[in-house]
C-alpha cells in the first residue's frame, strides 16, 4: 500500500529510468523498492525511525536503507526525491542535503500533500536550484520538479541549529535545537510542570521522546550521576539532544527507538512528556503504547512519571496498566502522573 504522495511519484516514474535515485524523508511504505522497476538503484534516508523499520527488511543489492539526519557517505545521484516535511522549517535543510548528493544538473523531485505546505515550494527552493515547476497534481498532492544549477554550500549542523539558554527549576541549561524539532525557546508549560515536581532518581533512567534534550539536561543538571538513556523516533531530535548534552558538558546514551522496542532491560526511572503529534493529526496512540510497554520495564521500586495534556484520554490507559498512582500536580492544561513500582 502506497501513500498518496508515493502514488504520485509512481505516476511519474518514467523520469527515473536507469537513474541512481536517492529518496529523502520517505514514508512508511514500499515506494523506494517499487522504484527499482525503472531506476538503476535506490537509496533511502528516513528521518523517522518507524519509516526506516518499515523499509529496512526490503533492502537488497540495489536498495540501501538508512536512518539519520545525513547519509554516512558522499555518493552522488541522478535524481533526489524529497518528501515535503510536516515540519515546514525542515524543508530548506532537506533541499541543501539533496543538493549535496546530486550530480551537476541532477533532477530534484519534491512531493507533498496539498494541506502540508508543499504549495510554497517555489518560494522555498534555494537559488542553487532552478525555479520549481509543477509536474503533477493528483491524490490531493503536488509534485514539483527542478534541477541543480549551482554549487550548494556544505552542510554544517551549526547553520541549522538555534542555541539558547533555558531557565529550569534545576538551573540554567543550554538547548541546541535543529530545524524541524519542536521548541518554544522557553520552558513549555507541560515540561515546566514535570520539572517542578521532578522526583529524586537513581540508577538507570529513561527519557522517552527526548526531543531536543530539555528534560535530559535538566535531569543531569540536578542528578549528574544518573545513567541516562534518551530515545526518540525523529533523527533531527536525536541529533539535537546530542548537541544539547554536549553543550552542557553532559553524557547520556542517545538512540532511536520505535516506542520502547529498541530498549532493553528494566529502568529505575522513566520520565517523559510524551509526544502526541503524529504528522498533521493529534493522536494518543504513541503515548498509550508507551504506557503499556513502560509498565513492563520498570524495575522494583522504580519511579514512572509523565506529564500529559488534560484533553488527551490517558487516564484509563494509565489506570489499567498501573492501578494505584498519584497526581502530584495539575493545572488547567496539564496533568502529572506518578507511580512507584512495588
UniProtKB/Swiss-Prot annotation:
Cross-referenced CDD domains: AdoMet_MTases (cd02440)
Signal peptide limits: none
E.C. numbers: 2.1.1.172
Main location: cytoplasm
GO cellular component terms, A-Z: cytoplasm
UniProt KW keywords: Cytoplasm, Methyltransferase, rRNA processing, S-adenosyl-L-methionine, Transferase
TM spans (from-to): none
Oligomer and partners: Monomer.
Similarity annotation: Belongs to the methyltransferase superfamily. RsmC family.
Role according to the record: Specifically methylates the guanine in position 1207 of 16S rRNA in the 30S particle.
Listed name of the protein: Ribosomal RNA small subunit methyltransferase C
Organism of origin: Shewanella sp. (strain ANA-3)
Amino acid at each position: 500500500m502506497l501513500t498518496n504522495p508515493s502514488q504520485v511519484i509512481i505516476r511519474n516514474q518514467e523520469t527515473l529510468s536507469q537513474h541512481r535515485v536517492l529518496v529523502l524523508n520517505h514514508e512508511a511504505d514500499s515506494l523506494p523498492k517499487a522504484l527499482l522497476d525503472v531506476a538503476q538503484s535506490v537509496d533511502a534516508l528516513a528521518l523517522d525511525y518507524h519509516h526506516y523499520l518499515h523499509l529496512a527488511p526490503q533492502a537488497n543489492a540495489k536498495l540501501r536503507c538508512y536512518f539519520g539526519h545525513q547519509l554516512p557517505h558522499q555518493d552522488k545521484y541522478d535524481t533526489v526525491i524529497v518528501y515535503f516535511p510536516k515540519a515546514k522549517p525542515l524543508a530548506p535543510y532537506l533541499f541543501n542535503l539533496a543538493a549535496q548528493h546530486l550530480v551537476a544538473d541532477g533532477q530534484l523531485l519534491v512531493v507533498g500533500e496539498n494541506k502540508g505546505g508543499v504549495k510554497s515550494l517555489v518560494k522555498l527552493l534555494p537559488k542553487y536550484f532552478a525555479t520549481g515547476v509543477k509536474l503533477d497534481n493528483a491524490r490531493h498532492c503536488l509534485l514539483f520538479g527542478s534541477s541543480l544549477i549551482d554549487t550548494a554550500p556544505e552542510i554544517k549542523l551549526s547553520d541549522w541549529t538555534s542555541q539558547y539558554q533555558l531557565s529550569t527549576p534545576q538551573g540554567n541549561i543550554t538547548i541546541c535545537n535543529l530545524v524541524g524539532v519542536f521548541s518554544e525557546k522557553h520552558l513549555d508549560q507541560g515540561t515546566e510542570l514535570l520539572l517542578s515536581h521532578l522526583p529524586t532518581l537513581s540508577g538507570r533512567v529513561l527519557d522517552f521522546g527526548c526531543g531536543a534534550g530539555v528534560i535530559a539536561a535538566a535531569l543531569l543538571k540536578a542528578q549528574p550521576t544518573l545513567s541516562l538513556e534518551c530515545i526518540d523516533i525523529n533523527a533531527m531530535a536525536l541529533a539535537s539532544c546530542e548537541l544539547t548534552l554536549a553543550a552542557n558538558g553532559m553524557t547520556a546514551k542517545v538512540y532511536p527507538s520505535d516506542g520502547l522496542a529498541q530498549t532493553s532491560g528494566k529502568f529505575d526511572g522513566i520520565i517523559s512528556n510524551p509526544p502526541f503529534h503524529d504528522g498533521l493529526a493529534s493522536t494518543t496512540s504513541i503515548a498509550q503504547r508507551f504506557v503499556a510497554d513502560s509498565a513492563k520495564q520498570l524495575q522494583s521500586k522504580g519511579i514512572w512519571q509523565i506529564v500529559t495534556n488534560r484533553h488527551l484520554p490517558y487516564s484509563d490507559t494509565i489506570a489499567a496498566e498501573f492501578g494505584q498512582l498519584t497526581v502530584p500536580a495539575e493545572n488547567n492544561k496539564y496533568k502529572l502522573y506518578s507511580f512507584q513500582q512495588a
